[in-house]
From Swiss-Prot:
Pathway in which the depicted protein is active: Cofactor biosynthesis; adenosylcobalamin biosynthesis; cob(II)yrinate a,c-diamide from precorrin-2 (aerobic route): step 10/10
Ranges that cross the membrane: none
Entry-linked CDD domains: vWA_norD_type
Organism listed in the record: Sinorhizobium sp
Enzyme Commission number(s) of this protein: 6.6.1.2
Major site of localization recorded for this protein: cytoplasm
Record bears the keyword Acyltransferase: no
Keyword ATP-binding belongs to the record: yes
Pfam short name (any one): CobT_C
Lineage: Bacteria, Pseudomonadati, Pseudomonadota, Alphaproteobacteria, Hyphomicrobiales
Superkingdom of source: Bacteria
UniProt gene name: cobT
Region (Disordered): 218-306
Alphabetically ordered keywords of this record: ATP-binding, Cobalamin biosynthesis, Cytoplasm, Ligase, Nucleotide-binding, Porphyrin biosynthesis
Protein name from the UniProt record: Aerobic cobaltochelatase subunit CobT
GO cellular component, one term: cytoplasm
């Protein structure tokens, strides 16, 4: 009786063990590292240090799902075997777009190495890539602006290195960009095959490609390159010849002999089901470790504002005098301390109320964080509620539980505060204090917060207008003032270091005019450069965009029209979640998700309520009504 119990899986998880063991062995063999830990969990697939995360299988996995899972494992194993993290880091170009393309092409390189050496790996990767692009709906893309350039370059590189056509679900993306890429970088592309086994030489060619495509600046011979004696100049050897042959045999067995892995897995599925769930959006990253981009995911274009101004008939006379500046650079430490003390004194009576609202928000977030668990797992916290099972049946294994991860753990929030003259007095002091306390609250909950401000450097046009006047007053100059975008707190800066920076908003003469559309684009681009899965942008303003210099030489709705176009672009074509709070100003006519408050003292409640609503589970938010105008 006991022997039968041992022979038959006793839990649903055990049914998948033969498949998981076989796949884990293949991954370690390809990676050439027996210490690699392979985990299957309801988390976004990824690789952190020595740990490779793969998605937990569904209850009844199909052959397609098994092949996709193998493809994900092969992709990450090849990355670990063939990519030297330090070389990748030091050779990486400047700029978010250039880095994204550079990383995508490196992933194409390592996958090409595996495909050329092992037929089983090639087949698994093909299935995984087909699934990846199908999920991203690339087949529906019709315009070049919607097609990610990085993915197109990676597809073209893969085609050149392996001779394989791109997956059918991604063919349109490459077709839209092929003429541009080959027209700009055909000569560089021809050198890729000869350097495929040398990461550093390959990276040099890719940087030349990016320069030819005008995505990255030209590099000198020694720019960003590691010393020769420290780098790997020999061919990448992801494993020994014996390992290579063994891995080939194992991978070939995956596809050619269903009786090995597929059949074993299928037979086990018939005997028992496995716990499974959809892959979550969360990507828990260990700080300080290299975390590769998830191979089974694709990112849509991160720059929805490429050529945007031209399309909406918005011009800028000159950007020569614009500035993006950290708040501490605008005044010295002593003045910042004095301004912060003044801010605290002005709002001493308000801090208690705002603090209570912030604590309420924190309790709601922490309740979400702690109330959701997964049960009947093979590892995690011991589930004391299931211990009676062992008394009833000693053959039952111990049961463990694990806390589920909620969406807000991998989230960044940007608070964009209008620093125009009309905010002077009560509105700006309340906004500064609310931003301060919310940043502290969200930081406690593991949510990163960025606080930005926008204004102009001068009244009545500043140096831009002077240049325009000196140039003979050309017609239709467009925006005619010097922008000042202020970083009060970056997303990665701890609250305690940035606290005093908010006092700058109290400085006499800081608040001038407001050009909202370009400020939104700026804040949006900063968010898009972040690695977090979820990005939220909250605008706090008290009126429509106003700049006397610009409006005196352009149509009266020039800035407002641009703002509306920017908002529509973010709301319809960007993954960033945009919401706005208007102080005494109806912002609901601009933003889909917006609330208007009558008095500045209502700001704290509005901010905490709207953020709390955003962080509610999707199922709870689905039935809730759209934000309504308040006040």
């Amino acid at each position: 009786m006991s022997s039968n119990s041992k022979a038959k899986p006793t839990t649903r998880e055990n049914a998948a063990e033969p498949f998981k063991r076989a796949l884990s062995g293949c991954i370690r063999s390809i990676a050439g590292d027996a210490e690699v830990e392979v985990a299957f969990a309801n988390e976004r697939p990824g690789m952190t240090g020595e740990r490779i995360r793969l998605p937990e299988l569904s209850k009844r996995p199909t052959l397609q799902e098994l092949a996709v899972t193998r493809g994900l494992g092969d992709s990450m194993a090849l990355r670990k075997a063939c990519t030297h993290a330090r070389i990748q880091r030091t050779m990486s170009p400047q700029g978010a777009d250039a880095r994204a393309i550079f990383d995508a092409v490196e992933q194409a390189r390592v996958e090409a190495i595996g495909s050329l050496r092992m037929a089983g790996v090639a087949k698994n990767l093909n299935v995984m890539l087909e699934e990846k692009y199908a999920k991203a709906n690339f087949a529906t893309i019709e315009r070049q602006a919607d097609a990610p350039l990085g993915e197109a370059v990676a597809l073209l590189v893969r085609e050149k290195l392996t001779g394989q056509k791109p997956p059918a679900s991604a063919g349109k993306v490459l077709d839209l960009w092929r003429e541009f890429i080959e027209g700009k970088a055909a000569g560089d592309i021809e050198h890729l095959s000869s350097t495929i086994n040398n990461q550093q030489a390959f990276a040099r060619v890719v940087r030349d490609m990016l320069t030819s495509m005008e995505v990255a600046e030209k590099y000198g011979d020694d720019d960003n390159e590691p010393d020769e004696q420290e780098s790997e100049t020999d061919e990448d050897q992801p494993r020994s010849q014996e390992q290579d042959e063994n891995a080939s045999d194992e991978e070939a067995g995956d596809d050619a002999a269903p009786a090995d892995e597929n059949q074993a897995a299928e037979e086990q599925m018939e005997e028992g089901e496995m716990d499974g769930a959809e892959i979550s959006d969360d990507d828990l990253q260990d700080e300080g470790d290299e975390d590769s981009e998830t191979p089974g995911e694709v990112k849509r274009p991160n720059q929805p504002f490429a050529d945007f101004n031209e399309k909406v008939d918005y011009a800028v006379f000159t950007r020569e005098f614009d500035e993006t500046i950290a708040s501490e650079e605008l005044c010295d430490e002593a003045e910042l301390d004095r301004l912060r003390a003044f801010l605290d004194k002005q709002l001493a009576h308000l801090q208690g109320a705002v603090g209570r609202l912030a604590n309420r928000l924190q309790r709601r977030l922490m309740a979400q964080q702690n109330r959701s668990w997964e049960f009947d797992l093979e590892e995690g916290y011991l589930d004391s509620a299931r211990l009676q099972r062992i008394i009833i049946d000693p053959m039952q294994p111990l049961s463990f539980k694990r806390e589920k991860d909620t969406n807000f753990r991998d989230t960044v929030v940007t608070l964009l505060i209008d620093n125009s003259g009309s905010m002077r007095g009560r509105p700006i002091t309340v906004a500064a204090t609310c931003a301060d306390i919310l940043a502290r609250t969200l930081e406690r909950c593991g949510v990163k917060v960025e606080i930005l401000g926008f204004t102009t450097k001068a009244w009545k046009g500043g140096q831009s207008r002077e240049k325009w006047l000196a140039g003979g007053k050309p017609q239709a100059p467009g925006r005619l003032n010097d922008l000042r975008h202020i970083v009060y707190k970056s997303a990665d800066a701890p609250w305690r270091r940035a606290r005093r920076n908010l006092g700058l908003m109290m400085r006499e003469g800081l608040l001038k005019e407001n050009i909202d559309g370009e400020a939104l684009i700026w804040a949006h681009e900063r968010l898009m450069a972040r690695r977090e899965q979820r990005r939220i942008l909250m605008m706090i303003s008290d009126g429509a965009p106003v700049d006397d210099s610009t409006l005196s030489v352009n149509p009266g709705n020039y800035l407002e029209r641009h703002l509306r176009a920017v908002i529509e672009q973010i709301e319809t074509r960007s993954p960033v979640e945009l919401l706005a709070i208007g102080i005494g100003h109806d912002v609901t006519r601009y933003y889909r998700r917006a609330v208007t408050i009558v008095d500045a003292d209502e700001l704290a409640g509005a901010m905490t309520e709207q953020l709390a609503a955003l962080f509610e589970d999707e199922s709870q938010r689905r039935g809730s009504s759209r934000l309504r105008r308040a006040g």
